[in-house]
From Swiss-Prot:
Stated role: Accessory subunit of the mitochondrial membrane respiratory chain NADH dehydrogenase (Complex I), that is believed not to be involved in catalysis. Complex I functions in the transfer of electrons from NADH to the respiratory chain. The immediate electron acceptor for the enzyme is believed to be ubiquinone.
Top-level taxon: Eukaryota
Chief location category: mitochondrion
Cofactor note: Binds 1 FAD per subunit.
Entry protein name: NADH dehydrogenase [ubiquinone] 1 alpha subcomplex subunit 9, mitochondrial
Organism the protein comes from: Gorilla gorilla gorilla
Pfam families: Epimerase
GO cellular component: mitochondrial matrix; mitochondrion; respiratory chain complex I
Name of the encoding gene: NDUFA9
């Protein structure tokens, strides 16, 4: 009798699962949808041990922004698939960011479509954070910002991915003097063509603990006087905090109205480059000695760093980007539209710049430093 009751329960459960699968399949239109999986059913009270219903593939997760995005996805109970090309020891810092079994690491080849298809086929969200500050003999800016995102977007669309998020740049412009920004603009277009519902994020220069923005300027103290084109009086910057960008990306994943939109992520204040670098040196308690260096001479210096066998501290393209004023894009939604209040630079700069202080000033209070002057241009 007990065996008969058990068999009836098994039959009911199997029928229920079949019915759920049939319903999930019947409501799918367009590209083929994968069968319902337990990881797609939200449950729990929130937190890393819950299930958010998000199965996200995050390309570029090992980079500066990627670790924050993975952490925010992991802490809400998402399953995160992390494609990587680096040594396994270089992804160890990501493992504690999710519950047991929720972070899956897969090796991939950026030029192999089968490899890309394998890492997106089980996801309902794909986030592309792939970027590079300088070109190499293996990957130039066109590869990184155009060809690879286009392939990922196309294969994600074919796999039935529900949400695709592509991170570009605020100053992406097909007519820009920077090859980096020109390819960013082309990348936006090809992604939009391949995945019309894609969400495009356009952040300004991002600052945070491991950035190449505040840290790059602060490290100039090693060279003595600080070279700035036109002393930085003709360039305006509006940097944004990395945690805000990460939260914005995650909120865009959860927002059903975000599909097909472009978002401009910027900080709350705009600064002349001169005042910004002066503030950076004040927080780092370093002597600020700026001098005007013509851009053609700056490019020549950058070329010397480019041909060195080490990671270039500056490149000719970075010189261009450094002296381009951040665009104002009031027609695009921003962080506020995703429920995020932008964090002022003055609140978080000390987290980044304390490491550049000498021992004498290591514990000095940030209140001793005057805030950077802001502009409205």
């Amino acid at each position: 009798m007990a065996a008969a009751a058990q068999s009836r329960v098994v039959r009911v459960l199997s029928m229920s699962r079949s019915a759920i699968t049939a319903i999930a399949t019947s409501v799918c239109h367009g590209p083929p949808c994968r069968q319902l999986h337990h990881a797609l059913i939200p449950h729990g009270k929130g937190g890393r041990s819950s299930v958010s219903g998000i199965v996200a593939t995050v390309f570029g997760a090992t980079g500066f922004l990627g670790r924050y995005v993975v952490n925010h996805l992991g802490r809400m109970g998402s399953q995160v698939i992390i494609p990587y090309r680096c040594d396994k020891y270089d992804i160890m810092h990501l493992r504690p960011m999710g519950d047991l079994g929720q972070l899956l690491f897969l090796e991939w080849d950026a030029r192999d479509k089968d490899s890309i298809r394998r890492v997106v086929q089980h996801s309902n969200v794909v986030i592309n954070l792939i970027g590079r500050d300088w070109e190499t003999k293996n990957f130039d800016f066109e590869d990184v910002f155009v060809k690879i995102p286009q392939a990922i977007a196309q294969l994600s669309k074919e796999a039935g991915v529900e949400k695709f998020i592509h991170v570009s740049h605020l100053n992406a412009n097909i007519k820009s003097s920077s090859r980096y920004l020109r390819n960013k603009a082309v990348g936006e277009k090809v992604v939009r063509d391949a995945f019309p519902e894609a969400i495009i994020i356009k952040p300004s220069d991002i600052f945070g603990r491991e950035d190449r923005f505040l840290n790059s300027f602060a490290s100039m103290h090693r060279f003595g006087p600080i070279p700035l084109g036109s002393l930085g009086w003709k360039t305006v910057k509006q940097p944004v905090y990395v945690v805000d960008v990460s939260k914005g990306i995650v909120n865009a994943v959860k927002d059903p109205d975000a599909n097909g939109k472009s978002f401009a992520f910027v900080g709350p204040s705009r600064y002349l480059l001169f005042h910004l670098v002066k503030y950076i040196f004040a927080v780092a308690h370093r002597l600020f000695l700026p001098f005007p260096l013509p851009l053609f001479a700056y490019r020549w210096v950058a070329r010397v760093f480019e041909i060195s066998p080490f990671e270039p501290w500056i490149t000719r393209d970075k010189v261009e980007r450094m002296h381009i004023t951040d665009m104002k894009l009031p027609h695009l939604p921003g962080l506020e539209d995703l429920g995020i209040q932008a964090t002022p630079l003055e609140l978080k700069a000390i987290e980044v710049l304390r490491r550049h202080r000498t021992y004498r000033w290591l514990s000095a209070e940030i209140e001793d430093v005057k805030p950077a002057k802001t502009v409205n241009i």
